[in-house]
From Swiss-Prot:
Documented EC number(s): 3.1.1.-
Entries under InterPro entries matching the protein: SEST-like, SGNH_hydro, SGNH_hydro_sf
Induction: By zinc.
UniProt key word Ion transport: no
Lineage: superkingdom: Bacteria
GO cellular component: extracellular region
GO biological process, one term: lipid metabolic process
Protein name (Swiss-Prot/TrEMBL): Esterase
Keyword set, alphabetical order: Disulfide bond, Hydrolase, Secreted, Serine esterase, Signal
Paired cysteines (S-S): 73-103, 156-180, 236-294
Signal sequence coordinates: 1-39
Subcellular location: Secreted
MF terms (GO), sorted A to Z: carboxylic ester hydrolase activity
Length: 345
């Protein structure tokens, strides 16, 4: 892989080469011997998982590579890629996992650029470096950090603006958190969001192009994000069993529908990118409306300031609205179902 290919975004050459590779693969498939339709592959399927903290399943302990720089990815040993892989094996579908390079904090461009780890812990190579010519399946989520969802949450919460909580800055620290719904709905935040979504769309296109170039035979599966805020936001006015904080802490209730609209827009952008790029999409948003952060005992999302399973220097780290064990299992089932569907085509 050349450094130019790693670092150039929106590269037309990647798209042209991808199209050529796909066309060649189609011709070879047509010329090859007929196989049995709908049969799962007999051989292990070389697979690469990629993504951010929602693929790594930040918040679930223990984490992998705890004693190395990759420990700062907070990738759970039992993340949804691991659980989905086992579930498929129980059905006779074996994934040969070449790598799981999912890492908390990853932006879309970290697929082709190095990722700086927090606290000066080092840097990781581009996630695309895990791809091989024989990779047959790629699965993962990227987009939330590029959109700046942590900054959006900070814009809406005085608690999250405290220095010890959630890295990053609010979109506009001069605007009060209490008015964040107005800020994103009709204020300066509206244009900021439009610009962010334009970037997300372009970079998701680049991501899928790159997978097609570096792993030309790979099925590409883009996984959306589970729904955080329910349709009925009055549920968010009650703390979950055993909790004292509300699921979204001090975020105003009138801002919660705005946050949900932003997440729905991200989901739609990811779905469109997958469709336009000829990839498959796992619509977790559509399938998790009964398991949001505000669904009490049924919640699949840990509350914003609810203690997760992780500790840092003896202090519990909050979930920051990431999937808990239940949510991880929902992710794993829907991803495994999609992989089974794809491999049985």
């Amino acid at each position: 892989m050349s450094s130019a290919m790693r670092k150039t975004t929106n590269s037309p050459v990647v798209r042209r080469l991808t199209a050529a590779a796909v066309a060649l693969g189609s011709c070879l498939a047509l010329a090859g011997p007929a196989g049995s339709a709908g049969a799962a592959p007999a051989d292990p399927v070389p697979t690469v998982f990629f993504g951010d903290s929602y693929t790594a399943n930040f918040g679930i302990a223990p984490v992998t590579n705890q004693d190395s720089e990759r420990g700062w990815c907070f990738q759970a040993k039992e993340n949804y890629p691991a659980v989905a892989t086992r579930s498929l094996a129980d059905k006779g579908i074996t994934l040969d996992v070449q790598a799981d390079v999912s890492c908390g904090g990853a932006l879309i461009h970290h697929f082709w650029e190095k990722q700086e780890l927090p606290f000066g812990a080092g840097e990781l190579p581009p996630q695309q470096d895990a791809l091989k010519q024989d990779t047959q399946l790629t699965v993962g989520s990227l987009g939330g950090n590029t959109l700046g969802f942590n900054r959006i949450l900070k814009q809406c919460s005085d608690e999250l603006r405290k220095p010890s909580l959630l890295p990053g800055d609010p979109v506009d620290g001069d605007e009060p958190a209490a008015k964040c719904g107005e800020f994103f709905g009709t204020g300066d935040g509206k244009q900021w969001l439009d610009d962010q979504f334009e970037r997300v769309g372009a970079e998701l296109e680049e991501l899928l192009d790159r997978i097609g170039y570096f792993a030309p035979d790979a099925k590409r599966v883009l996984v959306g994000y589970p729904r955080l805020v329910p349709e009925d936001t009055t549920k968010c006015l009650t703390a979950a069993p055993g909790q004292t904080q509300l699921p979204f802490a001090d975020i105003p209730q009138d801002a919660l529908p705005v946050l949900d609209q932003i997440q729905k827009r991200l989901n739609d952008a990811m779905k469109k990118a997958a469709a336009d790029g000829g990839a498959d999409f796992v619509d977790l948003y559509a399938g998790t409306g009964a398991n949001t952060a505000c669904d009490g005992a049924d919640r699949g999302i840990g509350g914003l300031l609810e203690d997760s399973q992780l500790e840092l220097l003896g202090t519990k780290i909050p979930w920051y609205a990431h999937p808990n064990d239940k949510g991880r299992d929902i992710q794993a089932k829907q991803v495994a179902d999609k992989i089974e569907e794809i491999l049985n085509r």
